[in-house]
């Protein structure tokens, strides 16, 4: 690497032409690098003009669903067979059977006949837990001082 002369100021460098020489040198180097790394010539890009008519628009066909039994299918028709309508007694019997299987009792009246004392007291438990919390809301400093309430 050759030694570069360092000018005392920008004005001296501009007057002596040093800045122009350095810029030209860097420009030549970058042009050489670009020439070396140039890719092979690309195929020309054809830009289509919208004013020229293009081919015919694509055709859209609307197809119909096949008919079943000579009747066109409607959106309300179901392919599933209709379930037989159950009587009130049958539905109540199935409900009682399912309730007994899940909850262990056949009718909702059995649940309501329990005295109030036998029912779990959830509300009382919450109140007891709240009373057991003894949180001190006025912190003390490490030396036992009043912490944040210290007068300054």
Curated annotation (Swiss-Prot):
Pfam families per UniProt: SUZ, SUZ-C
Region listing for Disordered, in residue ranges: 28-152
SUZ-C domain segment(s): 111-152
Domain of life: Eukaryota
Location of the SUZ domain: 42-107
Listed InterPro entries: SUZ, SUZ-C, SZRD1
Compositional bias segments (type: Basic and acidic residues): 89-100, 113-130
Residues making up the signal peptide according to the UniProt record: none
Similarity remark: Belongs to the SZRD1 family.
Protein name: SUZ RNA-binding domain-containing
């Amino acid at each position: 690497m050759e030694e570069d002369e360092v000018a005392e100021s920008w004005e001296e460098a501009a007057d002596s032409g040093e800045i122009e020489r350095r810029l030209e040198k860097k420009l030549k180097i970058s042009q050489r690098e670009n020439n070396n790394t140039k890719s092979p010539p690309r195929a020309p890009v054809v830009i289509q003009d919208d004013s020229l008519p293009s081919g015919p628009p694509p055709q859209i066909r609307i197809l119909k669903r096949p008919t079943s039994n000579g009747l066109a299918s409607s959106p309300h028709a179901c392919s599933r067979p209709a379930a037989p309508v159950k009587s009130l007694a049958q539905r109540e019997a199935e409900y009682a059977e399912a309730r007994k299987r899940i909850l262990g009792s056949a009718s909702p009246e059995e649940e309501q006949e329990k005295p109030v004392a036998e029912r779990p007291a959830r509300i009382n438990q919450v109140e007891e837990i709240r009373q057991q919390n003894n949180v001190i809301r006025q912190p003390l400093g490490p030396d036992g001082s009043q912490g944040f309430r210290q007068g300054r």
